[in-house]
Amino acid sequence: MSSENINISSTNVKGKCDNKCSYAFKYSESSSTAKNNGVLINLTYDSTSVPPVVYNSEKYIVENINIVSPSIHTFNNVSMPGEIIISHTPQSGGIPLKVCIPFTSSSESSSASQIITDIINKVASNAPSEGDSTNLNMNFSLQQIVPRKPFFVYTGEYSGVNANWIVYGELEAIPLSSTTITTLQQIIQAFPIATPGGDLFYNSKGPISGLQLGDGIYISCQPTGSSEEETSVEYDKNSTSFDFSNIFESPIFKSIIIIIIGCLLLIIIFYGISIFYKYLTTDGELPKLT
């Protein structure tokens, strides 16, 4: 592992990891508190009964969120105005997972831009100095912040602890206005955080879509569109039993009932026609039932 800070760039990629860097998430809303640590903004995130993240078959919960300025990574050898670092703790032991998204100065806006801007402004108003804390009084979800786009992956240290890193590239940076970036730089100071890492890999597919985490199903597979992947499904042992009452609401069940009724009607009609035909061909005598 190199002692130099890793540079997030396509020119540094050793290979693709579409098959071995599977990232799935379904983050819930949180009413967070923020603390100004002088060199970063630290945010709490509400815990949930179901881990919101699965990375390479391991389940993770959100530990905390940090906002720094400038970015702790370089992107094509250039620092970005800021970066959000989402720290995850493994549920069953293992190394932590960090998900990082850089900020860029832009007049464009997104839902992530609005959330980050609101957080920065609230901290600037209510916790502008080192050591200050504030309740944000806003609900937000990382679901609206983490892009469903390709990302880079490496394994490296953070504060002396080995971790898996997912880092979104410059193209996926969260746009913030120059005013918001200036506000951020006024309430926290730049601090060089070392991010040495090993080989850099690239997941061109992005996070897995369509998972229903929390319904007792966890899927460790590759992103949608990967034709060479096998999908393994692990069912929660505590999932509820099948509800037979749902059968009667099923469109398939209703279609089957309609077909059966239609067949019975056709049988009755043909039987009636047969009796009427025999009546006409036997001089008006109806056949006798024995």
Question: What role is predicted for each listed range?
Answer:
Residues 1-290:
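Alpha-carbonic anhydrase
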